[in-house]
Swiss-Prot record:
Region of interest called Disordered, as start-end residue ranges on this chain: 253-309, 382-433
Highest taxon above the source species: Eukaryota
Cellular component, GO, one term: cytoplasm
Regions of compositional bias (Polar residues) in chain numbering: 396-417
Record keywords: Cytoplasm, Meiosis, mRNA processing, mRNA splicing, Nucleus, Phosphoprotein, RNA-binding
This protein's encoding gene: mug174
Function field: Component of nuclear coiled bodies, also known as Cajal bodies or CBs, which are involved in the modification and assembly of nucleoplasmic snRNPs. Required for proper pre-mRNA splicing.
Chain intervals with Basic and acidic residues compositional bias: 382-395
Protein's name according to its UniProt entry: Coilin
One GO term of the biological process aspect: meiotic cell cycle
One term of GO molecular function: RNA binding
Compositionally biased tracts (Low complexity): 260-292
Knockout-associated phenotype: Leads to abnormal trimethylation of U snRNAs, and defects in pre-mRNA splicing including of genes involved in quiescence, and abnormal Cajal body integrity. Leads to an increase in cnp3/CENP-C protein, lagging chromosomes and abnormal mitotic and meiotic chromosome segregation. Leads to an increase in the RNA level of genes involved in meiosis and rRNA, and a decrease in the RNA level of genes involved in cytoplasmic translation. Decreases mating and sporulation efficiency.
Subunit structure comment from the entry: Interacts with tgs1; both proteins are required to maintain Cajal body integrity. Interacts with U2 and U5 snRNAs.
Length: 626
């Protein structure tokens, strides 16, 4: 079996072997012939060889080596898409043509061409081995990488329960794109208080935060009740034991403790003395506080958790964002906090104010109080922030549908007013002007025309169709040829003639039969005088396996055309308009699709095709009738 190698216009510069006119695929000494033989065998013999030569866009993604080459198989002058079963057409004596396509054309018809990527000819054997090994191991590797549903569920649950952090020491909160409430609030903050912007100076800070987050949430959920003053020191030791302190924050806390307690300013230089001064300050504050002692104690425990270490501030801020609070639940407290940490304040925010920093986005607040985090009544699932009960009047309609409710009421009022106008005898013009005035600028732009009336264009089109049907019937009755003055017949048709039932028109049209214009004479295929039977200009009808004009896929179809040139072996025919290919042109007027072989553009545009007499069947000669 021979394989011709050719190239489409314009020529594609592909390796030296592409200039070979034909290759004998039975010669195994040639590496190129061996490779092409394996390609043909893979596509024609039921995937016996299992080589990794694929077709289409999926195969383009699988190759990364060598130059890209688009090939197309052709037999008897027409292209064969790879999706066909080529075993029906291949024989030992067949000659296939392997056409090299340009890249743009190959990408346009990626499902119909072979895609080949080659390195230098010396590495073809190695490439074949690599392709085959990758193809055999691709499915096995995919099965190993797939996760079971149980494993995926566990990973999903673990990802939701724990905060995520990256390997580059950048903390990522649960709420990704949450806008900050004010940039000025964070402008004067210390370096350690900057959220999600600075890298940590401690290498294992991520692991420490990860552990502290779980331990603090667990501890706060178990101790949601009131924390007394005696248990305050235990709570401080439990949280500070799992969190690493940073020296810059300790210096900040010691400076604040100096201002609050001057008697203990000398002993606040070290880390231990700072914690003692903070605890003593908090205990003195709790003794002198007025009002409810339980709420003050809970507030002191939260502020003590913040002042004892620096990491707990970021932990409480980020972990509180995992919860979604209903809008308006803590409205009074949030208003008080906004007044405390206003953007116009010249002094930097204190540690206690930082613990209540929140975003402007509703229902996404930061709380460090354990009572607020563990409250069952305030915990709401995501997507359910709006928990306000709808009113009884509009309980069936949500807020986004308020416009539709108003439009419905407006529509009902308009209909009611139109009925009243009918009863009072208002003219149609007045009603139309009234409706236009009411619906002018309306959102929905409701049309008040009743269904079935149609526009003036629709009525005119229906009238033209009726006139055309009547004209055909008049032409059939008179048996006259159409002339230019017969156009007046349509205009002079009375209106009563146009108002007949459509059933009569359809019955009369069903009886119409177009008389054949040509008489076909079959021509025997055994005769060798085709060039004498079909002179130039004669009409012929034949059956051939050619490309579909629309889908460009091979099919057996009947075609009709006029003979342009004829010889003993081939015939050149100008096909009818319905049998020509649907060509596409670029901005320069050149054909960009459906180019096969070396057919010139002039013949493609004119619909001229060349066939061998041996490929035609059911050949008929057409002659005009008298």
């Amino acid at each position: 079996m021979l394989l011709k190698v050719s190239s489409c216009e314009p020529l594609v510069p592909i390796k030296q072997w592409i200039h070979t006119s034909q290759l004998d695929l039975s010669d195994s000494s040639s590496l190129v012939a061996d490779l092409l033989y394996n390609i043909i065998k893979f596509n024609f013999s039921g995937l016996e060889d299992k080589r990794a030569i694929f077709t289409g866009y999926e195969s383009i993604k699988r190759y990364t080596i060598g130059n890209e080459m688009f090939l197309q198989l052709a037999k008897d002058g027409f292209a064969l898409p790879v999706s066909m079963s080529y075993g029906l057409f291949l024989e030992e004596t067949d000659t296939l043509e392997l056409r090299a396509l340009p890249r743009s054309e190959g990408l346009h018809r990626g499902c119909e061409v072979l895609v080949l990527r080659l390195d230098s000819p010396n590495e073809l054997k190695e490439n074949i081995r690599e392709w085959s090994s990758k193809f055999m191991n691709s499915k096995a590797s995919q099965k190993q990488q797939m996760l079971s549903p149980e494993t995926m569920q566990k990973v999903d649950l673990a990802g939701r329960a724990s905060p995520r952090y990256q390997a580059n020491d950048s903390w990522i909160s649960k709420k990704r794109n949450a806008p900050l409430s004010s940039i000025s609030q964070y402008a004067n903050m210390p370096e350690n208080y900057a959220l999600n912007t600075k890298k940590s100076k401690i290498s294992n800070e991520n692991d420490t935060i990860f552990k502290a987050n779980f331990q603090q949430n667990k501890y706060e959920s178990l101790h949601a009740k009131q924390i007394s003053a005696s248990d305050l020191s235990l709570h401080q030791e439990f949280v500070s034991a799992s969190i690493v302190q940073q020296p810059e924050l300790n210096s900040l806390l010691t400076s604040q403790s100096k201002n609050s307690t001057p008697s203990e300013s000398d002993s606040s230089s070290s880390e231990s003395s700072s914690s003692v001064s903070d605890s003593s300050d908090l205990s003195s504050t709790s003794d002198s506080s007025s009002g409810d002692e339980s709420s003050d104690t809970a507030r002191q425990s939260s502020s003590d958790t913040i002042s004892s270490n620096n990491v707990s501030v970021s932990v409480s801020l980020n972990t509180a964002n995992e919860f979604s609070f209903p809008q308006g639940t803590f409205k009074a407290e949030n208003e008080a906090v906004e007044s405390e940490v206003a953007p116009s304040s010249s002094t930097p925010p204190t540690v206690e104010e930082i613990s209540y920093l929140h975003y402007d986005e509703p229902s996404q607040y930061y709380f460090s109080s354990p009572s607020k985090l563990s409250s069952e009544t305030t915990k709401v699932h995501r997507g359910c922030e709006n928990t306000e009960k709808p009113s009884e009047e509009g309980k069936n309609f949500t807020t986004p549908l308020s416009d539709s409710v108003e439009s419905e009421n407006t529509w009902s009022n308009t209909l009611r007013s139109s009925v009243e106008d009918d009863n009072t005898g208002v003219s149609d013009d007045n009603k139309k002007s009234k409706l236009n005035a009411e619906f002018d600028g309306h959102v929905n732009n409701i049309s008040v025309r009743p269904p079935g009336s149609g526009s003036s264009a629709t009525k005119a089109r229906n009238l033209r169709r009726k006139k055309a049907r009547i004209l055909k019937r008049l032409m059939q009755e008179s048996n006259d040829t159409f002339s230019a003055n017969e156009s007046t017949v349509v205009a002079n048709v009375p209106d009563s003639y146009l108002t007949k039932n459509d059933e009569e028109d359809s019955a009369s049209l069903a009886s119409l039969k177009v008389a054949p214009k040509y008489v076909s004479h079959p021509v025997s295929l055994s005769s060798n005088s085709f060039h004498t039977e079909f002179p130039i200009g004669s009409l012929m009808r034949f059956t051939v396996m050619d490309l579909n004009p629309v889908t460009c896929t091979p099919e057996i179809s009947e075609k009709t055309g006029r003979v342009v040139d004829c010889s003993e072996e081939k015939v050149k025919i100008q096909l009818d308009l319905g049998d020509r290919l649907d060509l596409k042109f670029d901005v320069n007027g050149e054909v960009i699709r459906n180019r096969y072989g070396t057919t010139p553009d002039e013949e493609l545009i004119e619909g001229i095709a060349t066939y061998e007499w041996s490929s035609l069947s059911n050949v008929h000669k057409l002659e005009l009738t008298n």
